[in-house]
Amino acid sequence: MSNEFSLNAEKRDVQGKGASRRLRRVDGKVPGIIYGGETAPVAISVSHNQLSHALQNEAFYSHILTLDVEGTNESVILKDLQRHPYKPIIMHADFLRVQKDQKLHVNVPLHFINEDKCEGVRQGGGSISHQQTEVEVICLPANLPEFIEVDMTSVQVEQILHLSDLKLPEGVELAELTKGSDHDLPVVAVHKPKGAKADEAEGEGEAE
């Protein structure tokens, strides 16, 4: 993984809604928690500006992060993020400890490549419809991908790519597919324009 992310954090001794509100309003910090593994959960706070800046990078959401908690480094992933419903404020952040020998369940983004070369669009006049923009993967920390590529070059009109069609890095599996074949969800499709379908139906009616 090419990107590296590190955040500074401080331990929180005082907790509760009032204390969290003061952290955000007065100190410009985001309350959070580190949990998981055999170590007890730790209540922390991180800089709102630093976290907001990091969140602008898509890779931050699917990357192993380093939290420097008053001089002690913790390897974590961002597990949950609570935002204000209408203000650009991060309310709370949950970080899950990472252990190199334990598999992670992480959502990673899909990158659709070569859409401009898609045969179903260039030759068939179709349009691309995305059903999924991210997928949940299961893997060891060392195998965690920042994203999964979906090559659209050879996708034809009325063709649908499912989860089982995705090319995964070694050591990575899709959480949905572990639940059975009925969870092989559609990811992306190339459809004919509605007008073209109507014209075809009309032509078939005249031929009869």
Swiss-Prot record:
The keyword Ribonucleoprotein applies. The keyword Cell membrane does not apply. Coiled coil: none annotated. GO terms for molecular function: 5S rRNA binding; structural constituent of ribosome. GO terms for cellular component: cytosolic large ribosomal subunit. SUPFAM superfamilies: Ribosomal protein L25-like (SSF50715). InterPro entries: Rbsml_bL25/Gln-tRNA_synth_N, Ribosomal_bL25/Gln-tRNA_synth, Ribosomal_bL25_b-dom, Ribosomal_bL25_C, Ribosomal_bL25_long, Ribosomal_bL25_short, Ribosomal_L25_dom, Ribosomal_uL5_bac-type. One of its GO terms (biological process) is translation. Residues 1-21 are annotated as: Disordered. Keywords: Ribonucleoprotein, Ribosomal protein, RNA-binding, rRNA-binding. Belongs to the bacterial ribosomal protein bL25 family. CTC subfamily. Part of the 50S ribosomal subunit; part of the 5S rRNA/L5/L18/L25 subcomplex. Contacts the 5S rRNA. Binds to the 5S rRNA independently of L5 and L18. This is one of the proteins that binds to the 5S RNA in the ribosome where it forms part of the central protuberance. This is Large ribosomal subunit protein bL25. It comes from Hahella chejuensis (strain KCTC 2396). The lineage of its organism: Bacteria, Pseudomonadati, Pseudomonadota, Gammaproteobacteria, Oceanospirillales.
